[in-house]
Swiss-Prot record:
Family listed: Belongs to the ClpX chaperone family. HslU subfamily.
Protein name: ATP-dependent protease ATPase subunit HslU
Organism the protein comes from: Buchnera aphidicola subsp. Cinara cedri (strain Cc)
Any Gene Ontology biological process: protein unfolding
HAMAP family: HslU
Keyword annotations: ATP-binding, Chaperone, Cytoplasm, Nucleotide-binding
CDD domains membership: RecA-like_HslU (cd19498)
Function in brief: ATPase subunit of a proteasome-like degradation complex; this subunit has chaperone activity. The binding of ATP and its subsequent hydrolysis by HslU are essential for unfolding of protein substrates subsequently hydrolyzed by HslV. HslU recognizes the N-terminal part of its protein substrates and unfolds these before they are guided to HslV for hydrolysis.
GO MF annotation terms: ATP binding; ATP hydrolysis activity; peptidase activity; proteasome-activating activity
One Gene Ontology CC term in the entry: HslUV protease complex
Matches recorded under InterPro entries: AAA+_ATPase (IPR003593), ATP-dep_Clp_protease_ClpX (IPR050052), ATPase_AAA_core (IPR003959), Clp_ATPase_C (IPR019489), HslU (IPR004491), P-loop_NTPase (IPR027417)
Source species, domain of life: Bacteria
Localization annotation: Cytoplasm
Length: 444
């Protein structure tokens, strides 16, 4: 992270997101400030809180993608939630505290995978010993590593070498493997997810750690045993401590559709009261409080919150003043143009056109998008967005799916062919779609 300067962060984001430079700069600075803060002494570090961000822009312009890619760059716990899913305390529905509980669960899984990866080499060695125990039997009552060493060294080395070289992969062995706990589905009322989790954990513990005798090929058994041995090397208390620390110091919470919980001036209904209640419940979470989770208490003082909304029927000033103050950095994202659509189709890593080409290539068909064909797809997508609901870059998926429908359906009949997606091909397949979209405006 020390090498990830704001300029480099923006460069990485440019690989996946087209345009929106102001938003990229804002999140890059926010992420770099996380690293800068961690270099300070503990007294000053605790005084510095993250500058939360409010992204304003229409749907499909890259708000969520920017936050998601940022979390991957930081290798930090990240959760995306929709503000409309939550209700004020006392109402039926999810409470905002569940955001932090879910985030902590994600951090536990993330740190667990990191520890397993770190211990994989040691776990593999232990897995080999378990398999060698079966291949070179010794009395069960007396089993230990010393017994294995007492066996002729030459025999052990021969089997170990064959095992490591994969020559025994298809040999079947019988092995004791921990049974998968029976999943018990409990339907809980909204807002009581924590109680459900506790009940599920209780039932799983009551079932005990049973083991099943299974007959498997050595290559399949090795994978399962490595996972088992790696799990045994995990210190649960240390895992929880690391996960909670990661949540408190590095995590990012992305709250989407925050404009939907704004109070509308034109109405004064109970729903507006509830919306304002959700905003007030979010206040302590964003400002900094302690949330109890099943893994321990989590302080939210240094979690970075990124909120976003289209604000088509409201403005950021419709949020309660206290919440506006907790989101000091405001970034406006621009609506996408035809040129943006053209770049989205070709420039990002694993662009949409690259994905379609790779999928159809599996059938032995080469798809070639010409420059004029790409331009026509971009123009068609932009035109439909302007005439209908503007869904931003997501419109490209609709258009391309329609465009590629015939090729996808008949690909087995076109084996070995090269198909050019040019202006003529696009006109032939998309003109009807555009006409239908235009007509639908006049139908009630």
């Amino acid at each position: 992270m020390s090498e990830m300067t704001p300029r480099k962060i923006v460069k990485e984001l440019n690989k996946y997101i087209i345009g929106q430079n102001n938003a990229k700069r804002a999140v890059a600075i926010a992420l770099r400030n996380r690293w800068r803060r961690m270099q300070l002494n503990s007294e000053l570090r605790n005084e510095i809180t993250p500058k939360n961000i409010l992204m304003i822009g229409p749907t499909g312009v890259g708000k969520t993608e920017i936050a998601r890619r940022l979390a991957k760059l930081a290798n930090a716990p990240f959760i995306k939630v929709e503000a409309t899913k939550f209700t004020e305390v006392g109402y039926v529905g999810k409470e905002v505290d569940s955001i932090i509980r879910d985030l902590t669960d994600l951090a536990i899984k993330m740190i667990r995978l990191q520890i397993i990866k770190k211990n994989k080499k040691h776990a593999k060695k232990r897995a080999e010993e378990r398999i060698l125990k079966i291949l070179i039997p010794v009395p069960k009552d007396n089993w230990n590593e010393e017994n294995l060493k007492e066996k002729p060294e030459k025999t052990i080395q021969i089997f170990r070498k064959k095992l490591q070289e994969g020559k025994l992969d298809n040999k079947e062995i019988e092995i004791q493997i921990a049974a998968t706990p029976i999943g018990i589905e409990i339907m809980s009322p909204p807002g009581m997810e924590e109680l459900t989790n506790q009940l599920q954990s209780l039932f799983q513990n009551l079932s005990g750690k049973k083991k099943n005798l299974r007959k498997l090929k050595i290559k399949d058994a090795m994978k399962i045993i490595i996972e088992e041995e790696a799990a045994k090397l995990i210190n649960l208390e240390e895992l929880k401590e690391k996960a909670i620390y990661s949540v408190e110091q590095n995590s990012i919470v992305f709250i989407d559709e925050i404009d939907k919980i704004c109070k509308h001036h034109s109405s004064a209904s109970n729903s507006d009261v509830s919306r304002e209640g959700v905003q007030r419940d979010l206040l302590p979470l964003i400002e900094g409080c302690t949330v109890s989770t099943k893994h321990g208490s989590v302080k939210t003082d240094h979690i970075l919150f990124i909120a976003s909304g289209a604000f088509q029927t409201s403005t950021p000033s419709d949020l309660i003043p206290e919440l506006q103050g907790r989101l000091p950095i405001r970034v406006e994202l621009n609506a996408l143009t035809v040129d943006d659509f053209e770049r989205i189709l070709t420039e990002p890593n694993a662009s949409i056109t690259t994905q379609y080409k790779a999928l159809i290539k599996t059938e032995g068909v080469d798809i070639i998008f010409t420059k004029k064909g790409i331009r026509k797809i971009a123009e068609a997508s932009w035109k439909i967005n302007e005439s209908m609901e503007n869904i931003g870059a997501r419109r490209l998926y609709t258009v391309l799916e329609k465009l590629m429908e015939d090729i996808s359906f008949n690909s087995n009949e076109k084996f070995g062919q090269k198909i050019y997606i040019d202006e003529k091909y696009v006109n032939l397949h998309l003109d009807k779609l555009i006409e239908n979209e235009d007509l639908s405006r006049f139908i009630l």
